[in-house]
């Protein structure tokens, strides 16, 4: 194979992100959304196989857990949770986020209220966030 054919073959190869690169890309998008008060649409875990629409999340904070996992905390206004679609504060692990995109939208009153109260990194008495990375 001539060198210019080899170069063309290399250029056309698809690029696959490693889990670390994908997590970094997700963190960048979610931190930007948290800092700018933006809404994201995310595909989480097995949502697609369940026939669920992408989740809509007002991003409040991104944190690093005691276990080394990254998490996003915010207000879900649409999405399958335990087989039903409802609004509530939610936490999502980065390693289960399949896709995330910033979308047009504004925080509703309940979401703004939840964000203004802040988050201590706990769910009930289970405090598992070591550090809030951005909000």
PLM regions: where:
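Bacterial N-terminal signal peptides that target proteins for export
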Residues: 1-7
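Core beta-strand-centered patch of the WYL/Sm-like small regulatory domain
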Residues: 23-135
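Hydrophobic h-region of N-terminal signal peptides that target proteins for export
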Residues: 10-18
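Short secondary-structure boundary segments
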Residues: 6, 21-23
């Amino acid at each position: 194979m001539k060198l210019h054919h080899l170069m063309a073959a290399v250029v056309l190869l698809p690029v696959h992100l490693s889990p670390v690169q994908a997590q970094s890309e997700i963190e960048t998008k979610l931190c930007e959304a948290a800092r700018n008060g933006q809404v994201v649409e995310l595909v989480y875990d097995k949502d697609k196989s369940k026939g669920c629409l992408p989740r809509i999340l007002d991003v409040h904070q991104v944190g690093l857990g005691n276990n080394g996992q990254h998490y996003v905390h915010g207000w879900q206004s649409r999405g399958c949770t335990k087989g039903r679609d409802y609004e509530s504060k939610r936490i999502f692990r980065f390693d289960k986020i399949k896709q995330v995109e910033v979308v047009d939208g504004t925080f509703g009153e309940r979401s703004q209220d939840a964000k203004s109260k802040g988050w201590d990194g706990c769910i009930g008495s289970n405090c598992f966030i070591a550090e809030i990375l951005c909000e």
